[in-house]
């Protein structure tokens, strides 16, 4: 009796387990890496087959981070087939049981196929737009028509990017945070952008453009984030790259000088040597990189006509001949303490020397009488030192990470200006010195935990920043400088922040929800003897949420919806109280009462892909409160114009961006980018306090503008590649005025030599010399038009060799 009862219980249990196992489904996940350098491999083919008869079950490709997920897998014996061009295909057996809903395979390492790599050159071009549609990635080496130039010049050709007045704009907005290797640095500006026109592109591997950052990024930068990724070799053993580029610009005079000034630069030389070394052995990777960019440029050649309601008409020219030498070097090591712990130590040094020789003549309406000649010499040295330490701990589960980092930056700005003021009846001589030492301390703690259908990201960050500045006027004879506006000022910034981000993903849906909380305290101490401004500051505690919802129609079509809230804090130079006299009669001054602007951004994007191309379209809107802009005004009994930053109220930016990429044939492919947007600045009224209080009132401004970029790439015989880039920028509104249309065409060719180790390139920018900047500014009681014929046409030739 008992024996029969026990037999029945066992049979029922077995049947129950069998039934449960048959209905059970499991999610398989893993992380694919390069076996040699441990870097994640995106876009790897992953196929699941049954072990019994090799029947295909399902398949996928790894994402941007090398991760893959296979859902709804029934318990059974299987094997994975992992393949990627240039790597040995790997077969891995796995057993999917019924006791867990989630099977983590951990890390799968792929070995490079040495035989394949020695016989052919592998060229795989990934989509610039990431699978999440929140980021665009561009390799510098693919930008043939701008090879050998600066980072700023390289960005001019990128989809969605425009360059105006030396600053990068994303979708018509220059409020961008620029990172180097994921960190803010003094080289590119904390909270703003600077120095991009002097960083050599030879030092850069790729550029990432993030239009919709998640909460793990700093909240600063309403237009988005640009991350500049420096070169770092990943091959085993000792290897490196050496390069040399030279060029010449300003091939002819586009617009003759006004009478009686020094000649403008012509046939300006450019020289850029570079060296990158790397040694990787077992658990140690050491790297060293040095680049030097020397340029002569006609930095500015602007012709201005000023018209006053109750005064004369003045014609003027601002010509600035510039010599620049920028040296940057980076050294460091990655130490894999064991399989789970890695320590990275690195240091960066940058030295930028700028010599400007400027001439600014002023004439009457018909240029028959010179009213004044302003000449200046600017001698500026910027020195940057940065030290970084980063520790990463990998838990047993793939993708389960703890990152701890510390970053210290020192940046010195040492400027000397010498002025000569020639008037019909007398001559004046003046000078001033400015010294600014910036110190920044950054600490971050980031934690990532994979979940069954996604992951959690959380962390904290602390920044402390101090910038004491001292400006000293050195009075000569017949001085016209505002000596009471000199003295000292000190900027202090403290920003602790905490964030959390949750990412969910299944077969059809993706969702991301994040929140960043920031406390900001800014204090700006001003010399009490300053004639206009007093000490000021502000503090706030604000939430910065972000959200993303995506629907995968199928493997080739996807729709994403984004929202985020961001802030743009005034940078120290925006509130700096000292007048700048590089233009003698349009004088720029900071404003300590300037406050942050806050932005709410919305975006709806769609991407469809096919075998040899893709199409991406996004509709976006930004609403900005407290818009930061520079306002120009005049004061009674003076023709001088003072340009001062102000908060101008609310503004709007709505638009549509499209990117179309297609390989037409084996030898020709295109990338077309179209961006159309509507800009609107509501009516506002502000008070400029310098040099005396005056009120400015502006009516509503709005315009429909945009830009088109067409990149044509040709793969020619004998391993020759060519690129032809056409850029058109439509008229747009700027503070108090408009900027006219601009267009240019760039051309570049390169040839692979020495079995792919060498590369020779030749390019020319703005080959028809058409990139001219025309502006119209309307103020109260005055207006002016300007046309800038600065140097845009440059021819370069260069050679790179990998070893």
Tell me the role of every PLM-derived stretch.
Residues 51-55, 77-93:
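A short, solvent-exposed loop/turn motif at the edges and junctions
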Residues 36-50:
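Short, ordered, surface-exposed loop/turn motifs in non-cytosolic proteins
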Residues 430, 457-556, 686:
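Signature of Gram-negative outer-membrane beta-barrel scaffolds
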């Amino acid at each position: 009796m008992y024996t029969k009862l026990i037999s029945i219980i066992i049979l029922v249990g077995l049947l129950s387990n069998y039934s449960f196992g048959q209905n059970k489904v499991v999610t398989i996940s893993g992380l694919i890496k390069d076996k040699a350098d441990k870097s994640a491999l995106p876009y790897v083919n992953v196929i699941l087959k049954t072990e019994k008869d090799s029947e295909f079950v399902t398949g996928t490709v790894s994402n941007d981070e090398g991760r893959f997920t296979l859902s709804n897998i029934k318990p059974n014996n299987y094997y994975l087939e992992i393949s990627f061009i240039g790597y040995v295909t790997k077969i891995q057996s796995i057993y999917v049981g019924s006791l867990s809903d989630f099977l983590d395979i951990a890390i799968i390492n792929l070995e490079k196929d040495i035989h394949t790599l020695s016989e052919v050159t592998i060229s795989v071009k990934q989509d610039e737009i990431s699978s999440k549609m929140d980021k665009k990635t561009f390799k510098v080496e693919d930008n043939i028509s701008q090879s050998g130039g600066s980072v700023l010049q390289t960005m001019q050709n990128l989809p969605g990017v425009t360059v105006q007045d030396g600053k990068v704009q994303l979708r018509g907005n220059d409020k961008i945070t620029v990172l180097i290797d994921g960190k803010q640095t003094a080289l590119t500006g904390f909270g703003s952008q600077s120095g991009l026109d002097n960083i050599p592109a030879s030092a850069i591997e790729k550029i990432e453009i993030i239009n919709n950052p998640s909460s793990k990024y700093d909240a600063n930068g309403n237009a988005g984030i640009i991350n500049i990724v420096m070169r770092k070799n990943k091959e085993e053993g000792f290897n490196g790259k050496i390069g040399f580029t030279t060029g010449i610009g300003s091939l002819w005079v586009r617009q003759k000088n006004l009478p009686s000034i020094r000649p403008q630069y012509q046939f300006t030389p450019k020289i850029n040597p570079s060296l990158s070394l790397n040694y990787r052995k077992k658990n140690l990777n050491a790297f060293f990189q040095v680049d030097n960019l020397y340029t002569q440029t006609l930095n500015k050649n602007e012709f201005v006509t000023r018209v006053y309601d109750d005064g004369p008409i003045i014609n003027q020219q601002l010509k600035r001949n510039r010599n620049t030498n920028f040296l940057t070097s980076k050294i460091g090591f990655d130490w894999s303490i064991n399989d789970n712990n890695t320590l990275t130590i690195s240091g960066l040094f940058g030295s930028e020397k700028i010599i400007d020789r400027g001439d600014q003549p002023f004439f009457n309406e018909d240029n028959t009488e010179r009213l004044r000649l302003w000449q200046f010499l600017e001698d500026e040295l910027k020195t940057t030192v940065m030290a970084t330490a980063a520790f990463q701990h990998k838990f047993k589960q793939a993708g389960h990470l703890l990152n701890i980092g510390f970053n210290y930056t020192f940046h010195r700005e040492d400027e000397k200006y010498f002025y000569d003021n020639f008037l019909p009846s007398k001559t004046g001589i003046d000078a001033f010195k400015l010294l600014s030492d910036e110190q920044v301390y950054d600490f971050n703690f980031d934690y990532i935990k994979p979940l069954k259908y996604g992951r959690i990201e959380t962390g904290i960050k602390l920044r402390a920043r101090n910038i004491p500045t001292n400006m000293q006027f050195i009075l000569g004879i017949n001085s016209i400088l505002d000596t009471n506006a000199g003295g000292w000022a000190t900027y202090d910034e403290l920003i602790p922040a905490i964030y959390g981000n949750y990412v969910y993903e299944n077969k059809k849906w993706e969702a991301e929800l994040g929140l960043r909380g920031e406390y900001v305290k800014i204090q700006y101490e001003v010399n009490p003897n300053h004639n206009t401004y007093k000490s000021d500051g502000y503090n706030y505690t604000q939430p910065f949420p972000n959200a993303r919802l995506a629907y995968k129609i199928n493997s080739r079509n996807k729709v994403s919806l984004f929202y985020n809230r961001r802030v743009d804090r005034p940078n120290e130079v925006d509130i700096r109280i000292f007048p700048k006299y590089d233009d003698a009669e349009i004088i720029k001054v900071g404003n300590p009462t300037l406050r942050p602007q806050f932005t709410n951004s919305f975006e709806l994007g769609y991407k469809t892909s096919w075998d040899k191309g893709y199409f991406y379209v996004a509709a976006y809107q930004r609403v900005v409160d407290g818009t930061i802009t520079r306002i120009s005004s005049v004061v009674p009994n003076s023709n001088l114009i003072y340009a001062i930053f102000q908060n101008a109220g609310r503004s709007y930016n709505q638009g549509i961006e499209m990117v179309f990429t297609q390989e037409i044939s084996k030898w020709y492919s295109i990338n077309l980018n179209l961006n159309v947007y509507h800009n609107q600045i509501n009516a506002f009224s502000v008070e400029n306090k310098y040099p005396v209080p005056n009120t400015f009132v502006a009516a509503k401004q709005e315009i429909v503008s945009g830009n088109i970029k067409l990149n044509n790439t040709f793969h020619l015989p004998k391993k020759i590649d060519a690129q032809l880039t056409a850029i058109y920028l439509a008229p747009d509104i700027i503070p108090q005025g408009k900027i006219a249309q601009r267009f240019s065409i760039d051309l570049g060719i390169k040839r692979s030599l020495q079995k792919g180790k060498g590369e020779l390139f030749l390019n020319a920018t703005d080959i028809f010399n058409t990139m001219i900047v025309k502006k119209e500014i309307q103020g109260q009681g005055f207006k002016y038009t300007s046309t800038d014929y600065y140097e845009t046409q440059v021819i370069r030739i260069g050679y790179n060799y990998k070893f």
